[in-house]
């Protein structure tokens, strides 16, 4: 368990599958890319089988708090962000696949007092700059942690660019 490993925090994920399936039918209506890992005939059914309900997230947060471990969650869409923000975690993570969702930043800026951890995988340099500029203009910059990441699992060593961390420090 996280407690036995002396973890300070755990991070879960929350998606609103129906929203993402409507936005990305080419992904969600097809079979899981690794059929032996699939929990359903389509990626949508696979994700639905794995997704925790908001009640389960509430229970996970309470369990974490019982053991002095910080609960957090990656939110993949606005509805998921709203649901998780209402649990009041110290921070919410925005995954690479959702880091350009400005409506999510807008809602969180007005309704969530915690910090934002934002993965910058899958972004161009211009998109990265636009995200930073937008967050600064919204007055959120003091609450932001940027993650240098490469969206690949596993990542080939040739694609790892750790020098980019210094670049992010320049913001």
Regions found by a protein language model. Name each.
Residues 1-171:
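Catalytic cores and adjacent flexible loops of soluble metabolic enzymes
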């Amino acid at each position: 368990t996280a407690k036995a490993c002396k973890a300070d925090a755990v991070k879960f994920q929350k998606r609103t599958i129906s929203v993402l399936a409507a936005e990305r039918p080419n992904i969600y209506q097809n079979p899981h890319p690794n059929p032996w890992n699939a929990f359903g005939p389509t990626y949508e059914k696979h994700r639905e089988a794995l997704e925790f309900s908001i009640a389960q997230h509430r229970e996970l947060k309470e369990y974490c708090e019982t053991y002095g471990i910080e609960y957090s969650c990656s939110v993949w869409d606005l509805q998921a962000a709203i649901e998780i923000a209402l649990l009041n975690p110290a921070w919410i993570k925005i995954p690479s696949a959702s880091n350009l969702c400005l409506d999510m930043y807008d809602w969180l800026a007005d309704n969530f007092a915690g910090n934002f951890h934002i993965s910058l995988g899958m972004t161009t340099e211009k998109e990265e700059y636009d995200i930073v500029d937008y967050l600064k203009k919204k007055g959120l910059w003091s609450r932001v942690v940027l993650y240098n990441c490469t969206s690949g699992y596993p990542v080939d060593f040739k694609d790892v660019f750790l020098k980019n961390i210094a670049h992010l420090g320049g913001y």
